[in-house]
Amino acid sequence: MFMNPLLPPLWPMIATAVETETEIAPLVLAGVLLSLVVIYFASKLGGEVCLRLNLPPVLGELVGGVLVGVSALKLLLFPEGGLAPEDSLVIQLLMGSADLSPEAAQSVFSAQSEVISVISELGVIILLFEIGLESNLKELIRVGPQAAIVAVVGVVTPFSLGTIGLMTIFGVAAIPAIFAGAALTATSIGITAKVLAEINRLSSNEGQIIIGAAVLDDILGIIVLAVVGSLVKTGEIQISNIIYLILSATGFVVGSILIGRLLSPFYVSLVNRMKTRGQLLLVSICVAFVLSYIAQIVQLEAILGSFAAGLILAETEKREDLEEQILPLADFFVPVFFVCVGAKTDVSVLNPAVPANREGLIIAAFLILVAIVGKVVTGFTLFGKSELNKLAIGVGMIPRGEVGLVFAGVGAASGALDPATDAAIIVMVIVTTFVAPPWLRAVFEGAKKEEAPEKPVPTPD
């Protein structure tokens, strides 16, 4: 075989690359396994503490992520932000046990971070699929106009105030401001529903309006996220582009639901005919992944597809079985997303002792104010409904919870948010999640005392 003497022989180079890759692969796996141990330990510890404090476990998962991430223990780190392998305690452990060179350590750090990031993205896809399953379109239609008014006002008001305020008052660039404004839109169904159930108000008129509006809020919020995410990809803000994205996102959800209803009998028939274990879960996950793929290739967010899949399958007779079967899968993947969001959040950028950080704190305070006011006003838009506890409806729409974290996670991953704005959104989510439950209880209990008839004062004989 003819070989050019001026060119270096390729085989030794290829062999060296293969050997290096072969040596690194087990270490990448070891790094992923150690990272998952850290993630699950942090999520369970934080979740258990919050549950005992009568707070949503998801908040504990977020705080657990903050503790093990870049802000504190540095057990779970990612290359974003210029972090080096030596900064990660997990990589330090691997370097000490395997005598890694700096180049090999960088390769392991990058590869294991990519794997964890992919698992995190799968977690948010499954989370939105689960939220879609829990959304009852028929119930939403029943509460109808009142829930729609609350939802639309609850999306438009905080989004407009947040975006315009960040751009005009703080001079934030358009796309980060739009992303932060979008993070103010969605309401956490789970947190509000839990509080309403605890105080026996879930079936009340106010409770039904809140839940119906929260469901519609989620749909509108995910559409807003898809539109904003697409704006980040294109890098352009044009009215025609925004209108196209809104129409395409709305059309995708509506079209998916309509087509899904036509194909639902085939889905049920297929699942019933299959005899192997896990047929319902795997077929359903395939539906979610296919719609996520379609959403992704048409320049929308993958989570919009999984959410639409959940809405579709929630209308079938398999809903209850699927809700039960999806739980173990969600328990495995979803905590990875929340802990990673917390781990990537550098709360040191909000340290008031550093003068340069004070603007970030002011932005956080501004977002918290808009997040609360923008939702409280929603109840008072129901004109002519004096019998309703309008303040309770508004307060019930305050908590952002997991949906707000989805916005923060997607925004940070896409590079649309700088560390200070990302941390400000995280603080907003934490504060609204803390504030809403006790306030909602107090509002309903106060109304109950006012409704109680006064006892007659006994007259002396």
Swiss-Prot record:
The record's Gene Ontology cellular component field reads: plasma membrane-derived thylakoid membrane
Q: What is the effect of changing residue 402 to A/Q?
A: Lack of activity
Stimuli inducing this protein: Induced in response to increased CO(2) concentrations. Expression is under circadian control.
Task of the protein: Na(+)/H(+) antiporter that transports sodium from the cytoplasm into the thylakoid lumen in exchange for protons. Contributes to sodium homeostasis and tolerance. Also has Li(+)/H(+) antiport activity under K(+)-free conditions, but not under K(+)-rich conditions.
Q: How does it sit in the membrane?
A: Multi-pass membrane protein
- pH dependence of this protein's activity: Activity is pH-independent.
This entry's Gene Ontology molecular function terms read:
antiporter activity
Q: What is the lineage of its organism?
A: Bacteria, Bacillati, Cyanobacteriota, Cyanophyceae, Synechococcales
> Where's it found, cell-wise?
Cellular thylakoid membrane
Keyword field: Antiport, Ion transport, Membrane, Sodium, Sodium transport, Thylakoid, Transmembrane, Transmembrane helix, Transport
Q: What is its main location?
A: membrane
State how changing residue 114 to A affects the protein, per the record. Strong decrease in activity
Which residues span the membrane? 22-42, 58-78, 113-133, 148-170, 175-197, 209-229, 239-259, 280-300, 360-380, 391-411, 424-444
Summarizing the annotation, the consequence of altering residue 217 to A/N is:
Lack of activity
User: Record's InterPro entries?
Assistant: Cation/H_exchanger_TM, Na+/solute_symporter_sf
Against Pfam families, the record matches this protein to:
Na_H_Exchanger
Name the GO terms of the biological process aspect: proton transmembrane transport; sodium ion transport
- What name does UniProt use for this protein? High-affinity Na(+)/H(+) antiporter NhaS3
Look up the domain of life of the source: Bacteria
Q: Changing residue 359 to Q does what?
A: Strong decrease in activity
The entry sums up its family as follows: Belongs to the monovalent cation:proton antiporter 2 (CPA2) transporter (TC 2.A.37) family.
